[in-house]
């Protein structure tokens, strides 16, 4: 049986992404795509995301995050592929 490789991505979402349920949306989508990691509001009004999982799932997750929730608007999504840490057992909202 082939082993599924874990990949990781670090993202910064800009736009109308705070006060619109964006972190909860990201957490729910992470669960949908079996992604592990975290999401965090940043003081500058952006949202930071670290996500780990299979590359195909991450690609789909990134596309959904870029689309954003109904009342939010992502004007720019910075995406950097990074080394996975494999430290996560789920996906959390950080404060």
Stretches with model-predicted labels:
Residues 1-95:
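Intrinsically disordered, low-complexity, mixed-charge
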